[in-house]
């Protein structure tokens, strides 16, 4: 059974809802998965995981949350190696450019990004289903 951490930061609860759906999808595919706030996760825990999903909403000028999420993300990039990674998050304006930049950053670091997913504002039923599919995809990667 693979072990997957779904690490997220949320400001309004939208990304938390997405994280829970990703974890449920991974569990449905037979993985052991847990959604965990970024403040409760460290790069030291990456070694215990077979795959990791990271969730962060767009902040400010289409960027990652700088105080809690980004430092953990930066630390994890150096230890993920070729473990499958998924990226997800919500946004309220713009077109989701932060996700394009985030994916480029991950790939430039040599990470194996299996997929990305964005939702505008609160995830609707379609977005929640897509999050579940993302979790299943990560579990099967």
Q: Which positions does each model-derived feature cover?
A:
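FMN-binding flavodoxin-like domain, especially the glycine-rich phosphate-binding loop
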Residues: 3-4, 14-17, 21-38, 48-141
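Aromatic-flanked redox-active Cys/Sec active sites in thiol-based oxidoreductases
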Residues: 8-12
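Helix-turn-helix
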Residues: 41
């Amino acid at each position: 059974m693979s072990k997957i951490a779904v690490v997220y930061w949320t400001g309004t609860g939208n990304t938390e809802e997405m994280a829970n759906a990703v974890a449920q999808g991974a569990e449905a595919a037979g993985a052991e998965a847990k959604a965990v706030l970024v403040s409760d996760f460290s790069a030291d825990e990456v070694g215990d995981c077979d795959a990791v999903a990271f969730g962060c909403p767009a902040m400010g000028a289409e960027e990652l949350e700088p105080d809690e999420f980004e430092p953990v993300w930066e630390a994890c990039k150096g230890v993920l190696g070729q473990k499958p990674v998924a990226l997800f998050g919500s946004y309220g304006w713009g077109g989701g450019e932060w996700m394009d930049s985030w994916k480029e950053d991950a790939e430039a670091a040599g990470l194996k990004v299996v997929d990305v997913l964005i939702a505008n504002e609160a995830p609707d039923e379609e977005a929640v289903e897509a999050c579940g599919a993302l979790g299943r995809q990560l579990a099967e990667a």
